[in-house]
Amino acid sequence: MCKRIVGLDPIVFEDSRILIVGSMPSAISLKEQMYYANKNNRFWKILKEIFQTEDKIELLKVSHIALWDICHSCIRKTSADSEIKDIEPNDIQGLLDRYKNIEKVICNGRTSQNTMQKYFPNIETVYCPSTSSANAQFSLEQ
């Protein structure tokens, strides 16, 4: 039997302008208590290439990026998005109301985008292909 898992708190700053919304942290990310902690996930590699800094929190701060996931909690057997069931969403609208500088919401992956559209149809989002290594159709260079 699968048990309910709870995601991470948002990483957000007063001057964040972009919110990147994932689906639910992987088991590795939950264990490490850091978004995109799986070494095979390309998220941090992409941002480090653009912003030329190694410190993850500093990288988010200087790039005015906030991170959160659409799922506050869910039932999931493995880290695969296809396994996500019984979603309790995070209060994305509440976060946007609190942090007025956020002007763009980017969904990291199709599950994130579809779930955002289901629970928050009035929030405009931009789709970005998943940075997960499970999304093998795109290379890091692409």
Describe these PLM feature segments:
Residues 134-141:
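Short, charged, surface-exposed secondary-structure boundary motifs
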Residues 2-104, 110-114, 119, 126-129, ...:
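A polyanion-binding, active-site-adjacent surface
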